[in-house]
Regions:
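Core alpha/beta nucleotide-donor-binding catalytic domains of modification enzymes
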Residues: 2-107, 117-121, 126-129, 133-136
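A short, glycine/Asx- and small/polar-enriched loop/turn
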Residues: 64, 155-160
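Conserved S-adenosyl-L-methionine
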Residues: 52-53, 117, 140-151
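S-adenosyl-L-methionine-dependent DNA methyltransferase catalytic core
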Residues: 1-27, 134-138, 160-330
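A short beta-turn/loop motif at secondary-structure boundaries
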Residues: 152-155, 247
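Conserved beta-strand signature within the Rossmann-like core of class I S-adenosyl-L-methionine
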Residues: 109-113
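Short glycine-centered, acidic/aromatic-flanked micro-motifs in structured strand/loop junctions
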Residues: 115-121, 149, 305
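Charged, glycine-enriched surface loops/patches
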Residues: 127-148, 166-168
């Protein structure tokens, strides 16, 4: 796979890129319009990387030739937590058309695309059918599956739908592909990810928000179910302070999402707020990358960006198994 070249579309902060680079593929550039994400991407990979900008404005002839497309196309119009708009909603829902336009114009051999699980059932499954038909009409054999990052080396519950495709002329009619079920590399435990030492992230009674949390435990949804001492009695217990109820997790975290706040965990008898650095580790960003942005990018921005990112180990494992099935050798 060392000879394969790829472009990183709707790149975010490069989770997909890391997954492919772990297999020896070479990145020729990326496409991202969020300026804050672009800064973090630059800290990770260098500011000399070529950003081709707005996917919908790219002229294919301005792109280099490449073999592999990776992209996490925007999920807002499909997400089960969004407003359930669809492909006809706005430009966010049109991004798939921009990706297909480039796939066809550049005659790209392979792709991996990611979206939220909610895409499957949106509009009673019609949105999924449209996406699959677009890719099929573009000349690809397409496979899709919902995978959970929890099975791929990180202690985070994160279900996403993944699409993989190969040009039809590169495989015969007997070709079949089955998605991997688990990660073949080193898995990280919760304790290995929740390692932040910054004391400003301790959540205790000295903070005004702590009193809000105390009242939250007594609201109509949580009243009588939990108390502070009991919650603090389990190391690395994770608390998700949703509006309706308190959800508790052991040995794993809930899905990181853009705009999600209120994830706490217990360590050494104290509540701590999840940090952006820790969120990167929960997305399988290597520490050497997370260290590059420590103290440079604000905690709130890193939390948002990690929540938007692709889990690098999932992309790595899919690409490895897909290329093995096709016959490419690393």
């Amino acid at each position: 796979m060392n000879s394969l070249k790829f472009l990183d579309f709707c790149a975010g902060i490069g989770g997909g890129r890391i997954g492919l680079e772990n297999l020896g593929m070479k990145c020729l550039g990326f496409s991202e319009i969020d300026k804050d994400a672009e800064i973090t991407y630059g800290e990770f990979f260098g500011y000399d990387e070529v950003n081709y900008g707005d996917l919908m404005q790219i002229e294919p002839e301005d792109l280099p030739d490449f073999d592999f497309m990776v992209g996490g196309f925007p999920c807002q119009t499909f997400s089960i937590i969004g407003n359930r708009c669809g492909l006809d909603d706005d430009e966010r829902g049109q991004i798939i058309y921009g990706l297909v336009r480039i796939l066809k114009a550049k005659d790209v051999k392979y792709f991996i695309l990611e979206n939220v699980k909610g895409l499957i059932h949106h509009d009673k499954g019609n949105t999924l059918k449209v996406v699959l038909k677009l890719l099929d009409d573009a000349g690809y054999r397409v496979y899709y599956e919902v995978l959970n990052s929890l099975d791929f080396g990180v202690p985070q519950m994160r279900e996403r739908i993944y699409f993989v495709g190969v040009k039809k002329e590169l495989v015969d009619d007997s070709f079949r592909y089955e998605f991997p079920k688990k990660y073949s590399g080193k898995s990280e435990s919760l304790e290995e990810c929740l390692i932040e030492c910054d004391r400003t992230l301790i959540f205790d009674e000295s903070l005004p928000a702590y009193q809000t949390f105390y009242k939250y435990l007594d609201n109509k949804y949580n009243n009588g179910k939990h108390n502070i001492d009991e919650l603090l009695s389990h190391e690395y217990r994770v608390l998700d302070t949703r509006q309706s109820d308190l959800r508790i997790y052991h040995n794993k975290t809930p899905t990181l999402r853009r705009g999600r706040h209120g994830i706490l965990y217990v360590r050494e008898g104290q509540f701590r707020k999840l940090s952006g650095y820790e969120a990167l580790l929960l997305q399988k960003f290597p520490k050497r990358y997370a260290d590059k942005v420590r103290g440079k990018i604000s905690n709130s921005k890193l939390l948002q960006q990690a929540g938007n990112a692709m889990t690098s180990s999932v992309i790595e494992e899919i690409a490895k198994s897909f290329m093995k099935a096709i016959g490419e050798k690393k």
